[in-house]
Amino acid sequence: MRKKSLMLAAVLAAGVMMAACGSTSTLPDNSQDKPVASQQTESKYSFELKGIELKTDGDLTEYTSKLGEPSGGYYEAKSCAFEGMDKFYYYDSVTLQGYQKDGNDKLYSITLMDDAVKTKEGVRIGDKKDKVVSAYGSDYTEADGQLLYESGNTRLSFVMKDDEVQSLSLIHISEPTRLRCI
């Protein structure tokens, strides 16, 4: 089961990296309606792990020093969306992905890997769409099988199949410094 979770984490992490390098043409262009990430207010979305509140674009080094050694290991790769390296920390049931900004490691995404953990609002993998909407409201975008909520510089993504949560992530909304993907 652990091997399966690690494989799923690797696939999801690769998907997040590739999404940063790909087109977002399936999402509506709301650029006129919303300020760019650097001008946005702080996000209301966060995730708590081992009593530590994790927020996207927060200090990844601080978070990982408090969380300790990741049980599933650590991986890094040259970033195709940001300067420097992308970093992946595989904790029980949660994957943290980091990126470098101005020479500092920042938290890019938090991905919940199984139903052992839940959001502060009580939503976990396996819950129905009705529970997501009840917890987070109806102000979401539905695209590519996902329910997408945005607040400040954070996108909360629920991947759905048959109206059931398959995966959920908090992702930092930012403008990549330059794309180096092929």
Could you describe each region identified by the protein language model?
Residues 1-5:
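Positively charged n-region of N-terminal signal peptides that target proteins for export
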Residues 62-102, 124, 129-170:
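A cross-family detector of function-defining hotspots
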Residues 7-13:
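Sec-dependent N-terminal signal peptides
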Residues 17-20:
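C-terminal motif of bacterial Sec signal peptides marking the signal peptidase cleavage site
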Residues 171-182:
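Single conserved hydrophobic/aromatic residue that forms the stacking wall/gate
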Residues 24-69:
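N-terminal, intrinsically disordered, polar/charged segments of Gram-positive cell-envelope systems
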Residues 48-54, 116-123:
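Second-shell loop/turn segments in exported
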Residues 41-48, 108-117:
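Acidic/histidine-rich, surface-exposed loop or edge segments in extracytoplasmic proteins
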